Amino acid sequence: MTPSPATTEIGNRVRWVIILALLYCACLVTLGPTVQFSQWYIGPDNNQAAAEAEAWLDGRLTLPGRGGDTALYNGQVYNIFPPLLTVICFVYYGATSWLNDGMPLVFFTPLYVLIVAAPIPLLAYYAFRRSGADTHWAAVLAFYAIAGTCLWPVAGMLGGNAAMVGDNRAAWIYSIQHILAQTGLAIILIDLLGRRRMWLAGLGLLIATWSRQTCFLYCLPILWIAWNQPQRRRALILAAIPVAITIALPGGLNWAKFGNPLETGYRHIFDVDNPNRRIVLGADGDVHLFGLGHVPGHAKEMFLVPPQVFTTHQGLRITGWGPRTALWYGSPLFLFTLIDARRWWRDSVRRVLMLATIPVIFVGLMWHGPIEGSSGYYRYTLDYSLIWMAAITPWTTGPTRRWIVLACLAWSVFYFYSISGNP
C-alpha cells in the first residue's frame, strides 16, 4: 500500500526533527566538555559591547573606563567593535531593566548561548541542504563546520579555555564576533543557493558585517546575483535596502564617536601609553593598521605553517609552532576547494561566492599582527570557511568521497580536541 502524501510529509518532518536533534546532541557531547556553555558570561564588566549597551541605556556613547581593546579619543573612551553584540545587549538589558528595575546587567546564560551559538547548527544544516547535500549528509557537514574547524577552539575561549588565559577572555569579544558571523554567513548561503529572495541574503550580510567588518565584501556576490535575477530592479532594491542599513548604523556610530563614518576608532587603541603601539607604528611615526608588508608572513601562517605534534604523559598533543597554523592541517576537507576548483567554477553562484572570499582573505592578510588567540589554528579562516564548504558540497557525496570526508572529519575532530586546551 502506497502511503498518502500527507503521511509521507509527516514522516519526512519527523525524520528531519530526529536528524537535527542528533546534530545538536553530537555538538553538545563533542564540544561541551571544552566549550562549557554553562560558564559563558557577559556583562559590562568584562565585554566592551556590553559596556557600550549600558552606556546607550544611560544616553551616552562613552565608556566609563578602559578595559580590553578600547579607543581613547579626545579624552573619552569608546567601543570600537561592530555593533551587533551591542544591539543584542542593549535590547536585552533594556527589556530586563523595564521588567525589573535595578536588576544587574548580566545576560542570562542560557539565553545568551541560545542567541549567540544555538542557531549555527540549524542554519549550517540548511546551508548545506541548499548546497546540494541530502538530509543526512547535510547534518554531517554541519557537524564538520562546527567540530572540524577552528570554530571549536574559538568558542572554547568563552568557556573552558577562558580560565587558562584570564577572566577577561570569558567574554572575549573577538570570539563572540566570529561565532555571530557564522549565523550571517549561513543565512547568505541559504538564500543565494536557494530561493534568492535577496532581502534574506542582505539580512545575513548585516549580521555577518555587524560582527566582522570584512564580511561586508560579501555584498559583492549578493548584488551581482541580484543584478542577474529575472526581475532585476526588484531584486536589486530588496538587496540594496539591507546593504544600506548594514552601512548606516556603523557609519553613524563612527561619525558620532570619531567625526568620520569611515573611522572605526581602532587606531586609537594604540595611544602613547599602549605597550603594543610599536607593532603598528610605521617609519613615519604614524599608526598603520594595514600594510602589504604583512601579507607574506600572514599568508605563510594561514596556508603553510604546520602544527607542532608531540607526546606527553597524557598522550599525543598538537599545538602551533607560533601563534598560528595553516588551515589545511586541522581541516583537510578544504583541500577539495583546490581539487574541485573546475567543478565549482562552472557553477556561477558558487564561483562568485568563492571569488568574494579572495578580497576577504587578502584584507585579513594585510592586517597588522600578531593575530591573538590562534594557537594551532588561524581564526581568520572563519571569515570564509563556511563559504568554501558550501562550494564543494555537491562533490562530497559520492561513495568514495563520503569515506574520505568522514576520514577528514575524524582527523579534524581529533585535531581540534587535541588543541582545545591551548588558548
Question: What are the functions of these language-model segments?
Answer:
Residues 1-423:
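Membrane-proximal envelope and lipid/glycan-remodeling enzymes
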